[in-house]
UniProtKB/Swiss-Prot annotation:
Biological process annotations from GO: carnitine biosynthetic process
Provenance organism: Neurospora crassa (strain ATCC 24698 / 74-OR23-1A / CBS 708.71 / DSM 1257 / FGSC 987)
Pathway: Amine and polyamine biosynthesis; carnitine biosynthesis
Protein name per UniProt: Trimethyllysine dioxygenase
GO MF annotation: an example: trimethyllysine dioxygenase activity
Gene of this entry: cbs-1
Keyword annotations: Carnitine biosynthesis, Cytoplasm, Dioxygenase, Iron, Metal-binding, Oxidoreductase
Biased composition (Pro residues): 276-288
Length: 471
């Protein structure tokens, strides 16, 4: 589906739609506003296309239960659900621990020839008496889903794509709201899920521990070879260019992990001039005509003592969309050629993923872009493949790099104390311009799975979340 344009308007969280299948939009800007309507503040719900039209039926056959649900269903894949599968998916209090929601029976102790001896269908559910004298009750929504689908997929994950225009009114929530209630966490995680990043305004910045507490409202902070929560200045404490004052091109972090960091946060606590060195001996006084020029030059040097360091954000999913439209073959190469990645600059550290991974990782079920893994500095040797040569990969990567560097792709923002930035490291590439002076930044990583769990449970009722994760 081609992206559709979304205007640059102020939108409440409730207006940020979660419609199925409409995965991508072009995004201009968004800021969270507190809704005045109780209905607008209610949690999202997963949509259902079933309508009550028929009398329910359940009949015993040699293959399993032949089912006719009380709702009209379209795109049916089967009419019979197998006996053993049904018995294994009984969720009564005897079969599933209601506190942990884990099975508490041995699936393979069930007789392989298990079969129903009695079946009763109502408009709400189907009750089965099994040949092992166990009784199971299955809600129709569960049965109907597997009559029309093979497996549970991910939640509706509509995203909004953006470029440089997103800087006009970027996604923003307030620190007091996030810390005060799960509704605030819902706002924050929904913004990150849809747009890939969010600012948290009004965050205290005199104590970095407050930023740690903010991140822990989402989930625990991930510990890596860099430590956990970080608070650093450009002193090369670790052998990584992030610990310098050099410019950094757009990249994702931790490409060298099997499971790259899900979220990353930056909070600029301070940016000040570097401590002055002992002054050199004064030069001879300039001629009067040059005094004004020399004074202006000195003022310029003083002003540059704490400048630069703008942060760069690039929507990797939008860049991939552009690449696919402009050069489908380059997209195919970058999504199929698997590369080595590594972190080995520090003594005693040689980290690499469990296998080679492509720059653009696709969802195996849907074929949609799932994750961007791009840091040319951490990339290993391009392999010789049977389908594509290294030269072909380099040409495709050159086009990818060119898209990332387009002005229309780059969102430049100046971080400031009191306004942390949290972004999706699987989607949004980040970088910075070179800077002078001393910058102190704190932040941390959060695992992707923990972020998504928090997003689910603050944005949707648990009764709707559970079927999505348990099947």
């Amino acid at each position: 589906m081609r992206p559709q344009v979304v205007g640059a308007i102020l939108r409440s969280r409730a207006v940020v739609s979660r419609q199925p299948l409409s995965r991508t939009h072009i995004f201009a800007a968004v800021t969270v506003a507190k809704s005045s309507s109780p209905a607008q503040n209610s949690r999202r719900t997963f949509s259902s296309s079933f309508r009550r039209l028929y009398e329910p039926k359940a009949e015993i056959t040699a293959e399993g239960l032949e089912l006719s649900p009380p709702q009209a269903v379209t795109g049916g894949k089967r009419t019979v659900l197998p006996n053993f599968w049904l018995r294994d998916n009984c969720r009564c209090t005897k079969c599933v621990n209601q506190d942990t929601l884990q099975r508490n029976f041995n699936t393979f102790a069930i007789p392989s020839d298990i079969h129903p001896t009695k079946v009763e269908a109502t408009k709400e559910n189907v009750t089965v008496q099994w040949s092992d004298n166990h009784t199971s009750t299955y809600p129709w929504p569960f049965l109907s889903f597997y009559l029309t689908s093979n497996a549970r997929g991910h939640e509706n994950d509509q995203i909004s794509l953006w470029g440089s225009e997103a800087g006009s009114r970027p996604p923003t929530v307030s620190f007091p709201r996030v810390m005060a209630s799960d509704q605030g966490v819902a706002d924050l995680t929904a913004m990150i899920k849809e747009f890939g990043f969010c600012f948290v305004k009004d965050t205290p910045h005199d104590d970095p521990d407050v930023t740690r507490q903010l991140l822990e409202r989402i989930a625990f902070i991930r510990v890596t070879h860099y430590g956990g929560f970080y608070d650093f200045t450009p002193d090369l404490a670790m052998a990584d260019t992030a610990y310098t004052n050099l410019a950094l091109p757009a990249h994702t972090d931790t490409t060298y992990f099997t499971d790259p960091a899900g979220l990353q946060a930056f909070h600029l606590l301070e940016h000040k001039a570097a401590p002055s060195r002992p002054p050199p001996p004064p030069p001879p006084p300039p001629p009067p005509s040059e005094e004004k020029e020399a004074a202006g030059s000195a003022a310029g040097e003083a002003a540059a003592a704490a400048e630069g360091g703008k942060s760069l954000l690039v929507d990797g999913f939008n860049a991939a969309r552009i690449l696919k439209e402009e050069d489908p073959r380059a997209y195919e190469i970058l999504s199929s050629v698997r590369l080595p990645w590594h972190a080995s600059g520090n003594e005693g550290i040689t980290i690499a993923p469990d296998k080679l991974y492509p720059v653009l990782e696709l969802n195996e079920d849907t074929g949609e872009l799932h994750r961007v893994r791009w840091n040319n500095d951490d990339r290993g040797v391009v392999p010789f493949g049977e389908k594509y040569s290294p030269s072909e990969w380099y040409e495709a990567a050159r086009k990818w790099d060119g898209i990332l560097r387009r002005k229309s792709s780059e969102l430049w923002v100046q971080l400031e104390p009191g306004k942390p930035l949290i972004f999706d490291n699987w989607r949004v590439l980040h970088g910075r311009s070179a800077f002078s002076g001393i910058r102190r930044i704190c932040g941390g990583y959060i695992n992707r799975d923990d972020f998504i769990s928090r997003w689910r449970n603050t944005n949707y009722p648990r009764s709707e979340v559970l079927p999505r994760v348990t099947g």
